């Protein structure tokens, strides 16, 4: 008789989306099984840029300190260099990831965390371990074969790749986080827009001590312009730091029309030595793989009881470093909703807001990452590469900028402008931090639309419903230690911020608990309260007066705001929470299932 295992949620894939979904669901008390058809997590670095929003999620899980043990800090990320080779001449640099003194305050002001470089092969085990420690059942060598769903759940067919036996997992919900070639997406036939395989890239993982070439200009990425560097891939050669300064990933392109080439170790060594510019450097090739640049996103992320997340639904090049970040943020949006539906405090209609909120983000990041590819050709154009008919002519065109005279001066100007034009590739802080949601799980307050300085380049704090709760430091009244407003919310719970005149909101939160069974943590900020606003930053950024309130969802997004105390605070808050949870008609009473409370 075939084995059947029961669980609340089955997650397919242990990449950033799947591993974070497993960790979050387990933390929220949901019975979860996490599977991977391979024998361990990602063996190669893959994604690596880890932005502040993602670090906030790791912080919410209590994993920030562990993540930083394996990450290169922000200070080592910023001297992005464009050069002929690491040992050769430079064409220019651009300060990146907020390391420019003119941008650092923007980054420091918006989050209690800083971004870092955390390769995927170090990140995934942290998340998987967290999931397992919180009770998630983790199985490797377990392949997803297909599923059938009905009104009560999902039956997924799996294969144990160690013994070849097939078995069934019966779950309330299924999450497909199985990458850009997602079988779950294919089974659901989710609508996809865009193009796959636009160009081809070669990844060469290698060890080499390159300290003397890079330690004085620390960066994550070194962009190398050489003959052939404009063919396929990203349109430019790359040497990426994996571990400073002895583990690296070289990226070179290939013509996708001709298919991936056969890459011998000697060929790989030649590419790497050319990028370094010094054949005498000892090196060890540790891995060779190919991949393609994609431009595709799903317009619907779910069907019935099955959801898809991560690269399965947004497939794009690594420019802007959005891949693993967006994947983890997908799971942060979805996990609390599933948990609250399973424990009976939310209606299943809440789950529909996953697509409503995250599909626009999927489109945004795919479009931004592909648009960023267009920012590199002007550098090659300024150096005269496309015009050259031979390697010698290419070198001559590049050298011309070192001459005196108006022609060379014009070339230098074009080059500086072209390099500066990559600013939206590296410092698009708004793309990372300005995500806004508009769905039934957000109670609009009819405030005017925000006017952004530059929605892609600069973070803009707001407590307008749908925006992420802003970070400011407040101070514990007992010992005076600072704590972020972000640290006062999350952890799978709703949080209500108010001022010293908002004591009535405590009664309102109690009414929500009494009538809806949902706990709301109340944070009163003000003199003599548990948390004080010594610098006035909370008063400045909250956009409410002392009697108003800001309701924050478990995923840090503002769900409801009252700029002042309404006549019936309890009635208003209960009504808002009913809408957020989809319980206007109280249909959820029929949906209660056995699960540990969130």
From Swiss-Prot:
<feature type="binding site">
    <location>
        <begin position="8"/>
        <end position="37"/>
    </location>
    <ligand>
        <name>FAD</name>
    </ligand>
</feature>
<comment type="similarity">
    <text>Belongs to the PheA/TfdB FAD monooxygenase family.</text>
</comment>
<comment type="subunit">
    <text>Homotetramer.</text>
</comment>
<feature type="binding site">
    <location>
        <begin position="301"/>
        <end position="311"/>
    </location>
    <ligand>
        <name>FAD</name>
    </ligand>
</feature>
<dbReference type="Pfam" id="PF21274">
    <property type="entry name" value="Rng_hyd_C"/>
</dbReference>
<dbReference type="InterPro" id="IPR050641">
    <property type="entry name" value="RIFMO-like"/>
</dbReference>
<keyword id="KW-0521">NADP</keyword>
<keyword id="KW-0285">Flavoprotein</keyword>
<dbReference type="GO" id="GO:0046300">
    <property type="term" value="P:2,4-dichlorophenoxyacetic acid catabolic process"/>
</dbReference>
<dbReference type="InterPro" id="IPR002938">
    <property type="entry name" value="FAD-bd"/>
</dbReference>
<dbReference type="Pfam" id="PF01494">
    <property type="entry name" value="FAD_binding_3"/>
</dbReference>
<keyword id="KW-0560">Oxidoreductase</keyword>
<keyword id="KW-0614">Plasmid</keyword>
<keyword id="KW-0274">FAD</keyword>
<comment type="function">
    <text>Transforms 2,4-dichlorophenol (2,4-DCP) into 3,5-dichlorocatechol.</text>
</comment>
<dbReference type="InterPro" id="IPR036188">
    <property type="entry name" value="FAD/NAD-bd_sf"/>
</dbReference>
<keyword id="KW-0058">Aromatic hydrocarbons catabolism</keyword>
<keyword id="KW-0503">Monooxygenase</keyword>
<dbReference type="GO" id="GO:0018666">
    <property type="term" value="F:2,4-dichlorophenol 6-monooxygenase activity"/>
</dbReference>
<comment type="pathway">
    <text>Xenobiotic degradation; (2,4-dichlorophenoxy)acetate degradation.</text>
</comment>
<dbReference type="GO" id="GO:0071949">
    <property type="term" value="F:FAD binding"/>
</dbReference>
<protein>
    <recommendedName>
        <fullName>2,4-dichlorophenol 6-monooxygenase</fullName>
        <ecNumber>1.14.13.20</ecNumber>
    </recommendedName>
</protein>
């Amino acid at each position: 008789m075939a084995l059947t295992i029961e669980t609340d949620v089955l997650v397919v894939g242990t990449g950033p989306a799947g591993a974070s979904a497993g960790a979050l669901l387990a933390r929220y008390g949901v019975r979860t099984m996490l599977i991977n058809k391979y024998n361990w997590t990602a063996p190669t670095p893959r994604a690596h840029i880890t932005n502040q929003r993602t670090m906030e999620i790791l912080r919410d899980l209590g994993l920030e300190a562990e993540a930083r043990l394996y990450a290169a800090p922000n200070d080592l990320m910023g001297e992005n260099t464009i050069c002929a080779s690491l040992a050769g001449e430079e064409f220019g640099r651009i300060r990146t990831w907020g390391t420019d003194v003119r941008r650092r305050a923007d980054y420091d002001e918006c989050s209690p965390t800083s971004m870092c470089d955390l390769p995927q092969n170090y990140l995934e085990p942290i998340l998987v371990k967290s999931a397992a420690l919180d009770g998630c059942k983790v199985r490797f060598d377990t392949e997803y074969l297909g599923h059938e769903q009905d009104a009560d759940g999902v039956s997924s067919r799996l294969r144990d790749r160690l013994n070849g036996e097939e078995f069934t997992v019966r779950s309330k919900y299924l999450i497909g986080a199985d990458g850009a070639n997602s079988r779950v997406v294919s089974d659901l036939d989710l609508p996809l827009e865009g193009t796959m395989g636009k160009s081809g890239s070669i990844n060469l993982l290698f060890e080499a001590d390159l300290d003397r070439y890079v330690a004085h200009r620390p960066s994550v990425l070194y962009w190398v312009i050489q003959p052939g560097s404009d063919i396929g891939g990203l349109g430019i050669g790359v040497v990426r730091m994996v571990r400073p300064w002895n583990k690296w990933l070289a990226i070179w392109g290939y013509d996708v029309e001709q298919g991936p080439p056969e890459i011998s170790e000697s060929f790989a060594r030649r590419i790497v030595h050319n990028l370094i510019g010094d054949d005498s450097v000892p090196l060890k090739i540790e891995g060779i793989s190919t991949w393609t640049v994609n431009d595709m996103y799903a317009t619907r992320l779910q069907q019935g009881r099955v959801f898809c997340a991560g690269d399965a639904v947004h497939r794009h090049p690594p420019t802007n470093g959005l891949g693993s970040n967006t994947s983890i943020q997908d799971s942060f949006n979805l996990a609390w909703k599933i948990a609250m539906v399973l424990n009976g405090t939310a209606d299943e209609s809440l789950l529909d807001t996953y697509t409503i909120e995250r599909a626009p983000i999927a489109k945004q990041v795919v479009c931004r990452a592909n648009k960023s590819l267009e920012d590199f050709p002007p550098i090659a154009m300024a150096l005269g590469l496309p015009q050259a008919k031979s390697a010698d002519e290419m070198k001559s065109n590049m050298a011309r900028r070192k001459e005196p005279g108006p022609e060379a001066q014009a070339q230098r100007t074009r080059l500086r402008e072209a390099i500066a034009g990559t600013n939206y590739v590296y410092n698009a802080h708004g793309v990372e931090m300005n995500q806004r949601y508009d769905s039934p799980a957000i109670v609009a307050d009819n405030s005017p639309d925000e006017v952004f300085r530059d929605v892609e380049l600069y973070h803009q704090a707001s407590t307008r419903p749908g925006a992420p709760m802003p970070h400011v430091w407040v101070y514990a009244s007992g010992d005076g230690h600072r704590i972020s407003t972000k640290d006062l919310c999350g952890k799978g719970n709703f949080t209500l911020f108010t001022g010293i005149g908002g004591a009535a909101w405590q009664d309102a939160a109690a009414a929500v608990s009494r009538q809806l069974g949902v706990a709301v943590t109340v944070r009163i900020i003000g003199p003599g309260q548990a948390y004080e606003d010594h610098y006035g930053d909370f008063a400045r950024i909250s956009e409410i007066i002392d009697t108003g309130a800001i309701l924050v969802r478990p995923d840090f997004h503002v769900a409801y705001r009252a700029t002042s105390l309404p006549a019936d605070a309890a009635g208003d808050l209960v009504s808002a929470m009913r809408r957020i949870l989809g319980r206007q008609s109280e249909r959820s009473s029929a949906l209660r299932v056995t699960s540990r409370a969130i």
